[in-house]
Amino acid sequence: MATWAEVAAAEPELVRAGERLLQAFTLAFLATVRADGGPRVHPVTITVHDRRLYVFLVHGTPKRRDLLRDPRYALHSFPSFPRGTVESYVDDELVLFGWARPIENAETRAAVAAVHNDTVHERDLLFELEVDRAQHKTRRDGTAVYTRWAPGTSRDAAT
């Protein structure tokens, strides 16, 4: 597992593109593993702070219970954002896989809450999203181009 900063050190362009997507909407889709082993997908507000990825989860929500029981997650950014007009949409996507780690440090919680783009309640639990694999997809001249990262590897490939 790696922090977002460690991914940035290995694949800075992937992280820059990913942060543009995450900051364009501040929302992404978080997939967790239900108790029966099935997938569950939720929209969440993502916060990038100090080169780390965080999410606050409300008390009592299924996604919070899922991550406390099984920390594996997948995160998918919204797939496109406008560059002024409909004709200039950017067809980019960010997908992350990893483990969510609960953060109980009060200083970290306060620092993330200060820059979080939504209301944070006392019972909300902060998780850091550690990364096992990352992928950014864009299009160049109509061709999908993927940049992938995993610990010890990186590659740029057209598909």
Show where each model-derived region lies.
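Short, conserved active-site entrance elements at the starts or edges of catalytic domains
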Residues: 4-34, 159
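Short beta-strand segments
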Residues: 25-59, 65-67, 75-79, 86
